[in-house]
Structure formats: structure tokens, C-alpha cells
């Protein structure tokens, strides 16, 4: 997950500033003038904002990035509320969006129905036998949940024009193996909350107290066994170790306790002849468990997985139990989001491009696409110049890097071709969960149907209304959805320094992902190919390890350190994004000069603008959760650790040896 913004070169060069004051860009109220840039730059740049925005109990983290997401959500709320109040023709996108939203808002009906909407399927799951387990797992994988493992259709890592079936580790409700294996107090608290949650769900569907307790313990036991065999998140950063190809016959021979042909048939796929198993040891454990677990234990595990998936779309009792573990225990949130936000998430995700098309028509200025392309082109030139001037890389590898850079596909705003939702319906006579499930199944069927088809490289991995951006190594593309192309990241009334420090860094960040510890293993066509000389690869790794060690040295809470290995790709992208955006900024008229605005030089405004992007308040629980599961560093480290490698940052604020923010030249890292 990555971030981005909109900006146009033409706009920026037209915004040259004279001495004076602007009310756009850097806001002095965001600063904490009781400290200094050389002591703690994050506190200096963001302390005022953090003080003015105490954490609302519905959030575990809230920052300027989240403010932007909230602005986008308010736009979506206005759009969807209007649709929900209209009489829309049956089968139209307006009808589907409006009706599914209204059903989520109908708390009276949801509470009166209780567990009733899922009981037919629960009875079906209760009938599973070991002989029919493959078909049952396939039933669950069609949009409901991912018991034991997960599967999906994606581009072949070594032949990006062809779709391939992947089998991957999953089945752990807490998301990460460490939540099952670590013994620190916070992790134990999370496990206890999860056990309590499972117990409640079983009682909600009629289990007696003692039976519910035993069933919950069975679920935790199975998931803990899966966790023991799971790859760590650090190990999962190495794609080469997760590319293990089997024919269907070879797959069956390797994991004989599961009928793979029956499983794939259950997914509607009779043409599976090549399968990639991403985590071999994990699937060995799954195969072992299928053999050794009692039928009753398998049933209880599958039943829990089903109820867990349905809980957010049922009565308040289910919602509150779900919130207690996944939000309160894991993240430190104190109250649930209002119902309208939760209800909005359904059409926004499960009818995403349909909502996105309506969103773009109403809120996205057509000229923004052109302006953004100009800015991306400018940043691409700056990165190309930096690659050409690298002292640690050989000419041969530089040529390959530049070929890849110049082959980037750029997607801006919204797709040229919209997804067709005409085959799925929303029926208000059915329950909310039944309708949500129909949408989820439609989505899963669409994904699985891509097997045997050429990779659709025009397809987007995010909806247009998403406040985010991404780089996809399999298509060598960078994408900036409409949702991120708005203030405060791109502000046409702000000066170049502020725009380059925000959106410019974001664009540079996405580009640098093509050359981070994962992206560098893919060529210009999106294939996993080694295009590096052996010596250059070693030099890159040496620099990356040095950067990773800087982050791992940081304590995030109590005695817990950041994980510089797990966050390596994002750290490299932040570092590269800063250097590339700064290089591009220095080509603007403002960047070439030294005119003060509000008492700050252009370079100071650039770095303040970057820091303000990451201003946020966050709970301790969320800090610990993100350190386990999020490949991005915490906001404070994205500012303080990244900037301490930049000599231009030291020069901008007069930071010298002896200041806490200073890093000696020999200890700094420069990769891209």
C-alpha cells in the first residue's frame, strides 16, 4: 500500500512566489515552536497539528492522510445518500448502491433477524465430511473466508502475460503468525480477546456454554498450528522462494490428503494444469492437519470462519463482538464508527468501480488527469538523471534500470474501461448478509474466471475513489486514483515547494518501488528476471541493509523496535521519493531561488510539507499492531529516520554535529 498526489508541471512553474505570505501550503499552526528542527523534526513540524487534533475514540490512528480520506468519504456519503433516497430503476447501479446502503442502515431489521440470515449455510457447513472437505473449502473461498489456505488468480511472476493459480498461506483470523506465537503481554491480551470472541460467536448460533468454550479452543488450537508453519512477513518479501510450480498431478502427490481436482471443480475451474504454491512448509502442515484433525474439529473451525466473516453484516451483538477483538484489542479503538460509515464501506468496496464511476463524474476535474501526467513525466526525468549519476551501479545495470523506468505504465484518475456489474443483483427482500455474500461471490467468481485468460493490464487494482496509490511490479505500472488527487496533497494555490514536498515525494515514492528490494527483481515487462550484475546486486543489498538497520534501531513502544527488514521496501521508496522530488523541485523557479515565504526558505518549505503529510496521533496498541503487520514505517520514522540521510535537509535547517537529528556523513545512506 502506497500513497500519491496530483500536480502538474505547468501549474507549478506558474506559481512562482514573491516575498510575502501565503495561507496555503505550510501552516504555522501545525508547528511546535517549543522544540527545534535539530532536536526532533517530526515534533517541530507536526506537534501543533497533533495537539490540535486529539485522537477521536473511533480511530486507532488519525492524521493528515486520514483527514483526506474523511473528506473523500464525505463526498461518497453525499453521493450514496442521494441514491438511497431515490426511486431507482431495478438493476441500475443507482438501485444496487442505494439499496445495499439502506439495508446496512436498517438496524431494526438487522437486530430482529439476529443469526437467522446465516443459519442455512451454517447447517450446510455442519454437514461437512473429510471426503467432502475440498468442496466445502471451495465454497468458503468463493468470497466468504479463507480457511486453511487461500487461492487466487494473478499474473505468472515469470510470464506476466499469463494468469496463474496461486495457493497461499491463510486461515489465521488474527492475520499474522506472531499473534499466535509471541508471549509478550499485549499479544497474550489479543489472543484472550480472540478466544472470547470465538466463544461468543458460537453461543450466538445456539451452542451451549461448555460446547462454545471447547469449540473456541479448537479454533485457536488449529490456527496456532497453522501459525507455527507460516512464513514470517520478512520471509514473504522474497518472491523467488515463493515461486514453486506444480502440475495438478504433482500437487496431488505432494499434498495427498486433499483432493485438489475436487477443490478446483468447486471453484468452477476444470482447466487448472499449473499451480504455484507460495509457502511449501505451510501447505505441508495443512495437509497434515486435514489428516490428523477430527471431523468435529474441522467443522468447528469452518463454522467459526463463516460466522466471523458474516459478523459485521448482522445484528449489533455480532458487530460489537467483532469490534472488541479486531478494533479494540488489536488497535486500541474505543468506539465503533457510526453506522453510515460502516454501511458505506459495502458499496464502496463490493461495487467499487460502479461507485467510482459516479464519484469521478461528480468530483474529479477532467483537467487534473493532464496536469498529473505532466508532473509524473517531470519526476520520471529526475529519477532517470539520478540513476544515470549513481556511483555504486555499473553502466550495464544502469541501462537496464533506465529501460525499466522508461517503460512504466502510468494510470491516473480512473480506468478507461469500467467493470460490468450487470450480472449481480441486490434484492431488498433478502437479508443484508445474503446480499453482501452475493456481491462477494460475484467478485470471487470474476477473479477466478481470469484463469486461462490473458492478463488484463488495463485492469486497476484500486478503485478511483481510493485515497492511495500503488506500484505493481507484474505490470510495471504506477497508479494514482482520483481520490488521492486533491488537497492537501496537491494544492493549486500553494507554492512549488509544498506541492513537490507532498505529491512530488509520493510520485517519486511509487516510482522508486520499481527499484526497491522487491521491485528490482522484475524487468520492464513485469517478469521476475535478474537484470543486475552480481556486484551491483551485492552493493544494493549492502546499502539496503544499512538503511534497514537505521529503522530497526528505533524503539516504537516500550522495548519494541521497528522492523527495518519488514519495512525495507517502503523505506527505500520514501528515501528515493524524497531525493527524486527534491531534484525535480530544484529545477523550478522557486527551487532555483531563495525567496522567503512566512519566514521559511523554499527548501525548508519542501521538507516541512513532507513532514506534514505524516502528522498523526496513534494509540499504543495500533503502534504495536502496525509494527507486526504493516510494511510501512510509523509516520515519525518516515520523517525523522528518512530525513537524517539527506545533506540538503541538514543544510536547510542548519543542523550540525551534536544535534539529535544529525547523522554523520559516513553513516548516511543514498540508494536512488
Cite the ranges covered by each PLM segment.
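Short secondary-structure subsegments characteristic of cysteine-rich extracellular domains
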Residues: 58-80, 210-229, 499-505, 598, ...
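Noncatalytic, helix-rich "gating/capping" subdomain that lines the substrate-entry/channel surface
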Residues: 83-374, 378
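Active-site-surrounding "flap" and adjacent substrate/cofactor-binding loops of secreted or lumenal enzymes
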Residues: 35-39, 44-109
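Short, solvent-exposed loop/turn and secondary-structure capping segments
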Residues: 28, 52-56, 151-153, 176-178, ...
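Intrinsically disordered, low-complexity linker/terminal regions across diverse proteins
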Residues: 69, 219, 254-257, 276-280, ...
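Bacterial Sec-dependent N-terminal signal peptides
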Residues: 1-21
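Short, Gly/Pro- and small/polar-rich lid/capping loops
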Residues: 20-29
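Hydrophobic/aromatic-rich, well-ordered segments within soluble, folded domains that form packed cores
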Residues: 30-51, 180, 184-203, 568, ...
Amino acid at each position: 500500500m502506497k500513497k500519491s498526489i496530483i500536480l502538474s508541471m505547468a501549474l507549478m512553474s506558474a506559481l512562482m512566489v514573491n516575498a510575502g505570505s501565503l495561507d496555503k501550503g505550510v501552516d504555522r499552526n501545525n508547528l511546535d515552536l517549543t522544540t527545534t528542527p535539530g532536536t526532533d523534526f517530526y515534533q517541530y513540524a507536526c506537534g501543533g497539528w497533533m495537539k490540535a487534533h486529539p485522537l477521536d475514540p473511533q480511530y486507532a490512528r488519525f492524521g493528515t492522510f486520514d483527514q483526506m480520506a474523511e473528506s473523500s468519504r464525505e463526498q461518497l456519503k453525499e453521493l450514496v445518500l442521494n441514491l438511497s433516497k431515490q426511486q431507482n430503476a431495478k438493476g441500475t447501479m443507482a438501485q444496487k448502491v442505494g439499496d445495499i446502503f439502506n439495508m446496512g442502515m436498517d438496524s431494526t431489521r438487522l437486530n430482529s433477524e439476529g443469526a437467522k440470515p446465516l443459519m442455512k449455510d451454517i447447517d450446510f457447513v455442519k454437514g461437512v465430511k473429510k471426503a467432502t472437505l475440498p468442496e466445502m473449502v471451495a465454497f468458503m473461498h468463493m468470497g466468504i473466508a479463507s480457511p486453511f489456505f487461500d487461492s487466487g488468480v494473478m499474473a505468472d511472476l515469470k510470464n506476466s502475460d499469463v494468469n496463474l493459480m496461486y495457493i497461499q498461506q491463510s486461515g489465521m483470523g488474527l492475520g499474522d503468525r506472531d499473534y499466535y506465537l509471541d508471549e509478550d503481554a499485549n499479544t497474550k491480551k489479543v489472543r484472550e480477546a480472540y478466544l472470547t470472541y470465538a466463544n461468543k460467536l458460537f453461543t450466538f448460533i445456539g451452542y451451549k456454554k461448555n460446547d462454545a468454550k471447547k469449540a473456541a479452543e479448537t479454533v485457536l488450537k488449529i490456527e496456532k498450528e497453522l501459525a507455527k508453519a507460516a512464513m514470517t512477513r520478512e520471509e514473504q518479501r522474497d518472491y523467488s522462494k515463493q515461486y514453486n510450480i506444480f502440475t495438478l498431478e504433482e500437487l496431488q502427490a505432494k499434498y495427498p490428503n486433499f483432493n485438489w481436482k475436487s477443490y478446483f471443480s468447486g471453484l468452477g475451474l476444470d482447466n487448472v494444469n499449473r499451480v504455484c504454491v507460495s509457502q511449501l512448509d505451510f501447505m505441508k502442515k495443512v495437509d497434515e492437519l486435514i489428516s490428523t484433525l477430527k471431523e468435529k474439529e474441522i467443522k468447528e473451525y469452518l463454522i467459526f470462519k463463516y460466522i466471523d466473516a458474516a459478523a459485521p453484516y448482522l445484528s449489533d451483538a455480532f458487530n460489537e463482538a467483532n469490534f472488541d477483538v479486531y478494533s479494540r484489542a488489536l488497535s486500541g479503538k474505543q468506539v465503533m464508527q457510526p453506522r453510515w460509515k460502516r454501511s458505506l464501506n459495502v458499496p464502496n468496496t463490493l461495487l467499487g468501480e460502479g461507485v467510482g464511476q459516479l464519484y469521478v463524474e461528480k468530483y474529479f476535474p477532467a483537467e487534473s488527469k493532464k496536469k498529473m501526467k505532466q508532473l509524473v513525466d517531470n519526476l520520471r526525468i529526475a529519477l532517470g538523471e539520478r540513476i544515470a549519476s549513481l556511483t555504486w551501479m555499473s553502466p550495464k545495470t544502469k541501462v537496464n534500470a533506465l529501460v525499466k523506468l522508461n517503460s512504466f505504465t502510468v494510470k491516473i484518475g480512473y480506468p478507461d474501461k469500467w467493470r460490468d456489474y450487470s450480472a449481480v443483483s441486490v434484492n431488498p427482500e433478502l437479508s443484508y448478509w445474503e446480499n453482501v455474500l452475493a456481491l462477494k461471490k460475484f467478485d470471487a467468481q470474476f477473479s477466478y474466471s481470469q484463469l486461462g485468460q490473458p492478463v488484463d493490464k488495463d485492469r486497476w487494482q484500486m478503485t478511483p475513489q481510493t485515497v492511495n496509490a500503488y506500484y505493481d511490479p507484474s505490470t510495471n505500472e504506477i497508479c494514482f486514483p482520483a481520490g488521492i488527487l486533491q488537497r492537501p496533497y496537491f494544492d493549486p494555490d500553494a507554492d512549488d515547494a509544498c506541492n513537490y514536498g507532498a505529491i512530488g515525494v509520493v510520485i517519486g515514492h511509487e516510482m522508486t518501488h520499481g527499484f526497491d528490494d522487491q521491485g528490482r527483481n522484475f524487468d520492464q515487462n513485469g517478469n521476475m528476471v535478474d537484470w543486475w550484475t552480481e556486484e551491483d546486486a551485492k552493493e544494493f543489498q549492502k546499502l539496503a541493509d544499512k538503511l534497514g538497520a537505521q529503522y530497526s534501531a528505533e524503539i516504537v513502544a516500550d522495548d519494541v523496535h521497528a522492523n527495518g527488514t519488514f519495512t525495507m521496501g517502503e523505506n527505500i521508496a520514501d528515501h528515493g521519493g524524497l531525493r527524486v522530488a527534491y531534484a525535480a523541485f530544484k529545477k523550478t523557479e522557486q527551487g532555483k531561488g531563495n525567496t522567503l515565504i512566512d519566514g521559511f526558505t523554499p527548501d525548508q518549505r519542501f521538507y516541512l510539507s513532507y513532514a506534514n503529510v505524516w502528522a498523526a496521533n496513534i494509540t499504543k496498541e495500533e503502534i504495536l499492531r502496525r509494527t507486526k503487520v504493516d510494511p510501512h514505517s510509523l509516520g515519525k520514522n518516515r520523517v525523522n529516520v528518512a530525513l537524517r540521510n539527506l545533506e540538503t535537509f541538514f543544510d536547510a535547517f542548519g543542523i550540525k554535529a551534536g544535534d539529535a537529528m544529525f547523522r554523520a556523513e559516513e553513516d548516511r545512506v543514498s540508494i536512488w
